[in-house]
UniProtKB/Swiss-Prot annotation:
Keywords: Acetylation, Proteasome. This is Proteasome activator complex subunit 3. GO terms for molecular function: endopeptidase activator activity. Belongs to the PA28 family. It comes from Gallus gallus. Homoheptamer. Implicated in immunoproteasome assembly and required for efficient antigen processing. The PA28 activator complex enhances the generation of class I binding peptides by altering the cleavage pattern of the proteasome. The keyword Acetylation applies. The modification N6-acetyllysine is found at residues 6, 14, 195. Acetylation at the major site Lys-195 is important for oligomerization and ability to degrade its target substrates. Deacetylated by SIRT1. The keyword Acetylation applies. GO terms for cellular component: cytoplasm; nucleoplasm; proteasome activator complex. InterPro entries: PA28_C, PA28_C_sf, PA28_N_sf, Proteasome_activ_PA28, Proteasome_activ_PA28_N, Proteasome_activ_sf.
Length: 254
């Protein structure tokens, strides 16, 4: 079959070397890195910063004071009766356009520093999981034999493993999107507070979003740990079929 396609011997040697490197790295990931990482993340979940029960402790100062109300008089020369009422309604509509903000009174509006600290620890863990899953996925894909009739149950287990690894990659990538959406949503709300400083609901919404993000970050760390547990367990239970898909009779997946 090799004669049907001419392959440069030097290139083939480099490809074989790459396959060996991927195999060695992936097997070490499954056997050693995954269990160590799940224990590390489990320990992270027990740290005090991730076990705050009173969520008011993660609230941050808006640094946007409520300005004194501006007193407006609705009396206009030469206007009284119905004309004056009409002018009052027009003035009221004009005052709801919000405040033009050219500079913040107390300087830059900072993010919630406690959440930023957690995010800066979580993001590298997310990227690491994506990278390691990609390596293990490539390893399993390289182990899939050529398509032929007969006992393909082991191949189906390999494909199932690849699908699970791909799902974990996608979910981990969605965590990064979630963090970006938090920053964007919070920035828009803070801008609203700057424009409408007297509206308390905007201020309350920012604290609600911070609380929600804190809970979400803890959930993300839990999911990262659980994904390491699941992948480690699934691959170990099926390692014989993954490495030698057609070496024995069909067995159940687990």
């Amino acid at each position: 079959m090799a004669s049907l396609l001419k392959v440069d011997p030097e290139v083939k040697l480099k490809v074989d070397s790459f396959r060996e490197r991927i195999t060695s790295e992936a097997e070490d990931l499954v056997a050693n890195f995954f269990p160590k990482k799940l224990l590390e993340l489990d320990g992270f979940l027990k740290e005090p910063i991730l076990n705050i029960h009173d969520l008011t402790q993660i609230h941050s100062d808006m640094n946007l004071p409520v300005p004194d109300p501006i007193l407006l008089t609705n009396s206009h020369d030469g206007l009284d009766g119905p004309n004056m009422k009409k002018r009052k309604l027009e003035d009221r509509e004009e005052t709801f356009q919000g405040t033009k903000v050219f500079v913040m009174p107390n300087g830059m509006l900072k993010s919630n520093q406690q959440l930023v600290d957690i995010i800066e620890k979580v993001k590298p863990e997310i990227r690491l999981l994506i990278e390691k899953c990609n390596t293990v996925k490539m390893w399993v894909q390289l182990l899939i034999p050529r398509i032929e009739d007969g006992n393909n149950f082991g191949v189906s287990i390999q494909e199932e493993t690849v699908a699970e690894l791909r799902t974990v990659e996608s979910e981990a990538a969605s965590y990064l999107d979630q963090i970006s959406r938090y920053y964007i949503t919070r920035a828009k709300l803070v801008s609203k507070i700057a424009k409408y400083p007297h509206v308390e609901d905007y201020r309350r919404t920012v604290t609600e979003i911070d609380e929600k993000e804190y809970i979400s970050l803890r959930l993300i760390i839990s999911e990262l740990r659980n994904q390491y547990v699941t992948l480690h367990d699934m691959i170990l239970k099926n390692i014989e079929k993954i490495k030698r898909p057609r070496s024995s009779n069909a067995e159940t997946l687990y």
